[in-house]
């Protein structure tokens, strides 16, 4: 094992999600709407559920309507458990 790997702690399996920014009015925080699609066990119909999560945006670069990728992280506040990884597509 190399010394570089000994000193570096491994991040556990973190959830990476993609969603649209619906609010950027808070300082260094964005609200991202995530869509989850599941097939009903008995009837097979696709069911869509939406959830909104707060994510940390250190540089405040994301705007409303942007498609962003967020990653799970340690709790940053009461409601914030995600951080912005990248902006996949800017809003038009």
From Swiss-Prot:
Superkingdom: Bacteria
A Pfam family hit: Ribosomal_S17
Coiled coil: none
Keyword Ribosomal protein: yes
Keywords: Ribonucleoprotein, Ribosomal protein, RNA-binding, rRNA-binding
Claim: rRNA-binding is one of the keywords in the record: yes
Gene3D superfamilies according to UniProt: Nucleic acid-binding proteins
Cited CDD domains: Ribosomal_uS17 (cd00364)
GO CC, alphabetical: cytosolic small ribosomal subunit
GO MF entries: rRNA binding; structural constituent of ribosome
Gene Ontology biological-process annotations: translation
Cited function: One of the primary rRNA binding proteins, it binds specifically to the 5'-end of 16S ribosomal RNA.
Family: Belongs to the universal ribosomal protein uS17 family.
Subunit composition and interactions: Part of the 30S ribosomal subunit.
UniProt-recorded name of the protein: Small ribosomal subunit protein uS17
Gene source species: Corynebacterium diphtheriae (strain ATCC 700971 / NCTC 13129 / Biotype gravis)
Organism lineage string: Bacteria, Bacillati, Actinomycetota, Actinomycetes, Mycobacteriales
Gene name of this polypeptide: rpsQ
């Amino acid at each position: 094992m190399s010394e570089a790997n000994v000193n570096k702690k491994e991040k556990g399996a973190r959830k990476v999600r993609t969603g649209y920014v619906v609010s950027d009015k808070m300082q260094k925080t964005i609200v991202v709407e995530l869509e989850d699609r599941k097939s009903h066990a008995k009837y097979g119909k696709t069911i869509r559920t939406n959830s909104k999560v707060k994510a940390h945006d250190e540089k405040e670069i994301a705007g409303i309507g942007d498609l962003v990728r967020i990653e799970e992280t340690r709790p940053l506040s009461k409601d914030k458990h995600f951080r912005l990884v990248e902006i996949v597509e800017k809003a038009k």
